[in-house]
Amino acid sequence: MIVKEDLLPIEEVAAKLGLDRDRLYLYGPHMAKVLGEPPKAKGKLVLVTAITPTPAGEGKTTTAIGLVDALWRLGKRAALALREPSLGPVFGVKGGATGGGKARVEPRHEINLHFTGDFHAVTSAVNLLNALLDNHLHQGNELGIDPRRIELKRAIDMNDRALRHIVLGLGGKAHGVPREGGFELTVASEVMALMSLARDFQDLKRRLGRMRVAFTHEGKPVYAEDLMAVGAMAALLRQAFLPNLVQTAEGNPAFIHMGPFGNIAHGTNSLRASLFALGLADLVVQEAGFATDLGLEKFMNVVARTTGLVPEAVVLVATIRALRYHGGQDAYGMPDPKAVKAGLANLEKHVENVELFGYKPVIALNRFPSDAPEEIALVRAFAEERGLPFAPSEVYAQGGEGGLELAERVLEALDLPHAYRPLYPLEASLEAKVEAIATRVYGAEGVEWSEEAKRALKAAKKEGCEALPVVVAKAATSLSDNPRLRGRPRGFTVRVTDLRCRLGAGFVVVYMGGIETLPGLPKTPQAFGIDVDEEGNIRGMDY
């Protein structure tokens, strides 16, 4: 028979936050949508970021989960806010996104796979818009859309490089207008981004209508509202717009909702989930995708500005293995104090990035069994020399108990003065915004624009996008736009290859390097190790 986890009924988890049963729409005994409007925010927001990760990630999600459990052990009413996992990484390189060991969110298998169907709804809404666009072409193209200038892509929640660039509409006149097209990962779509930033249904519909999908032969932009797509898209998204409530392995509340990637979108959970968490809990721990150059930068420059959510403290997650990696060690699973010492340059840059926005980070060292005492001492000394709070985190092995010291440092940090400041004024030019991010956050010497990017920049200015904040899509495994540059690269120039106005989401996406919005699978994907036993239990997804 299928093994049932020893979990609390979701009604009991909700009761910890004062949520009554009639505010829940249940998806079985352990998952629920939260109904109604969020109460006025009263809680304090703790943002969790990290140093540049190795391909496997450094345990930012695990640390955030364990921190919430530790805060409850200290008598604090805390809630977790995370993004939903994408099937791309689940079956690709990283695996699931529900934490690991004793610091997990549950029911993890359901969350990692179909969950409450939110990603299906987003995917369907994107593909409906595509279908309406292609149908418009087929039915006479009254708007005069240029098939060569269609920006919209279809969506799929799977890493499948073969679908990046395709030709559709083949087979004769009855099968549509032939044109080039492609797919992107659902979490890279503009619909996912605007779902994460919309405040209510009215705002959601306004944002959907503002999505630019193509240009006419005369160069005039065409929006989703021009295709009369908004109402049907909103209907598909109605249930998905409601935040999901689940629990940690210790039975504490976790809001998990929406999932824009940190390297190709803005990289944090939905505004609705954060507002519910902040309205119901005293402390909210929220994760920002990847490292400070991606998720944190975008949170401070885009999310905080758009939503008004401003952190009270920042946790910076580091690991010994990542420091070895950035110190030049390929076999980063073995002790190497020399490599760790060299790799501290990467940690130093991420500390500086947090400080750019007005905060002193709490350094959380996510512990692994291979960590040597000498290596740990190097990181502790680094923090002490700079007057930064430091705590080892052993939540993977010990759950909330292993995060008590970190929780204490975070509570102390909440009382420290901070002054949130964005990196650039919104009235600055798009070039100046990109230059500020590249030089001050990445450490680049300058920015180079391709001819295609220059043309896109000119069009963006003409369309009135210059007052929007910038979201950079770039490699996540380096501070630069070159994924092979480890540590703290210096003397490099980043190259802008393209630019897109995302008026629905409310930002401009700037593409750097060879970033793809639809990843491919590795030679040995995580999918090879996943199975279902004779009794229906999932195997190979316990991280």
UniProtKB/Swiss-Prot annotation:
Family the entry assigns: Belongs to the formate--tetrahydrofolate ligase family.
Protein name: Formate--tetrahydrofolate ligase
GO MF annotation: an example: formate-tetrahydrofolate ligase activity
Catalytic function, reaction form: (6S)-5,6,7,8-tetrahydrofolate + formate + ATP = (6R)-10-formyltetrahydrofolate + ADP + phosphate
Enzyme class label: ligase
NCBIfam families for the chain: PRK13505.1 (NF010030)
EC number: 6.3.4.3
